[in-house]
Amino acid sequence: LTTLGFTGHSYTQRDREYCMSPSRTAQYKATIAKLKAEYKGKVDILCGIEWDILSEDKRTGYDYWIGSAHHLYGKNTGKYYEIDFRPQDLYDCIYDDFDGDPLAAVEAYFAEVEKVAALKPDILAHIDLIKKLNATGEFFDEESPRYKAAALKALQAAKGNNCLLEVNTGGVYRGYRKDFYPGPW
């Protein structure tokens, strides 16, 4: 092992359940700085951040950053929906703000991923996170031409911006899925 990177979630006002607060972010950076000093010459320690498109934190000041999207904005309600946590939120997003068309929500999500890719993150996180709560196909058909077209368009944006793709095992590890992100389009 020559290099080890740590990555915390950036702060977002919209959803504080999974992200570091500003004070925790400062503590995180200080802890990583101590580890860098402690392991200097043995292992390169890197300090990273998973920066959500709605984050209020800066992407600078880290050794690398991982770009991500976790929310969809509903034009009808003015709400931001976290698409990977509560099934009811995804349901409400689809029916209250995408006129009951789940693939319209999917297309909007992948458009958000394209926006993140355009910012040229070092790594693009869980590019198809919207499928997390859809293991049984209860919300949308992951094999539909619209789903695949939106996913492939986001993938092309990632490629065009030289983004590395994260292979994320979180959905499997936590029992939501049997497959990783990204899917095998």
Feature-to-residue mapping (PLM):
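A metal-dependent hydrolase metal-coordination microenvironment
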Residues: 1-95, 99-107
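Domain-core and long-helix interface of multi-subunit machines
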Residues: 66-74, 78-185
